[in-house]
Swiss-Prot record:
GO BP, sorted A to Z: CTP biosynthetic process; GTP biosynthetic process; UTP biosynthetic process
Reactions that this protein is recorded to catalyse: a 2'-deoxyribonucleoside 5'-diphosphate + ATP = a 2'-deoxyribonucleoside 5'-triphosphate + ADP; a ribonucleoside 5'-diphosphate + ATP = a ribonucleoside 5'-triphosphate + ADP
UniProt-recorded name of the protein: Nucleoside diphosphate kinase
Protein purpose: Major role in the synthesis of nucleoside triphosphates other than ATP. The ATP gamma phosphate is transferred to the NDP beta phosphate via a ping-pong mechanism, using a phosphorylated active-site intermediate.
SUPFAM superfamilies, per database record: Nucleoside diphosphate kinase, NDK (SSF54919)
Subcellular locations according to the entry: Cytoplasm
Coiled-coil stretches noted in the UniProt entry, renumbered to this chain: none
Main localization category: cytoplasm
């Protein structure tokens, strides 16, 4: 089943010049970029995005970190996109993520962990409108569809 997922490349990914390498990994897997934005997340956007963590002790630090520099927001589309991106991203704690995953290769910790990916269709439905209007999602085809 084709589905969509929201992916954020966090400030550490941008500062470390990993944008192209990470997007290449996602596209190489067969995921299609249908929306892409380089932006500075506002405090309101961050608090909304991480609202499920509002009562947790790390919430304030999370908001401060994600707003500390520019991010890349994107919507990816493909079969089982949510599950596929979560597998490619690796464990939330980069020090425990498997080599070959994005976090396993580029992250050493849990706070600065390079990438965010929606963890469910419900999360995508909450997160996507924080960063994109429906009109910014581009419906397009490769022409000759690539089969993976």
């Amino acid at each position: 089943m084709t589905e969509r997922t929201l992916v954020l490349l966090k400030p550490d990914a941008v500062k470390r010049r990993l944008i192209g390498r990470i997007i290449s990994r996602l596209e190489d897997k067969g995921l299609k970029v249908v929306a892409l934005k380089f932006m500075q997340m506002t405090k309101d956007q961050a608090e909304n995005h991480y609202s499920v963590h509002r009562s947790k002790p790390f919430f304030k630090d999370l908001v401060t970190y994600i707003t500390s520099g520019p991010i890349v927001a994107m919507v990816l589309e493909g079969p089982k996109a949510i599950e596929v991106v979560r597998i490619l991203a690796g464990s939330t704690d980069g020090s425990k993520a498997q080599p070959g995953t994005i976090r396993g290769d580029f992250s050493m910790g849990i706070e600065k962990n390079i990438i965010h990916a929606s963890d469910s269709p419900e999360a995508y439905s909450h997160e996507m409108p924080i960063f994109f209007n429906e009109s910014e999602i581009v419906e397009w085809s490769y022409g000759d569809e690539i089969i993976y």
